[in-house]
UniProtKB/Swiss-Prot annotation:
Key words, A-Z: Chlorophyll, Chloroplast, Chromophore, Plastid
Family membership noted in the UniProt record: Belongs to the ELIP/psbS family.
Organism: Cyanidium caldarium
Lineage, highest ranks first: Eukaryota, Rhodophyta, Bangiophyceae, Cyanidiales, Cyanidiaceae
Principal localisation: plastid
Compartments in which it is found: Plastid, Chloroplast
Protein name per its UniProtKB record: Uncharacterized protein Ycf17
Length: 43
């Protein structure tokens, strides 16, 4: 058990969910052509 922070499995799941959310936002942007990520200056 780590002294500080999250467990290793929690960090792994969090990273995978973050990657999935970013890929999903790219997919939605290309489908809807709203350019939300460009507006937020991520791309």
């Amino acid at each position: 058990m780590p002294k500080y922070g999250f467990h290793q499995s929690t960090e792994l799941i969090n990273g995978r969910l973050a990657m999935l959310a970013f890929i999903l936002s790219l997919f939605i942007e290309f489908i809807t052509e709203q350019k939300i990520l460009h507006f937020l200056k991520f791309l």
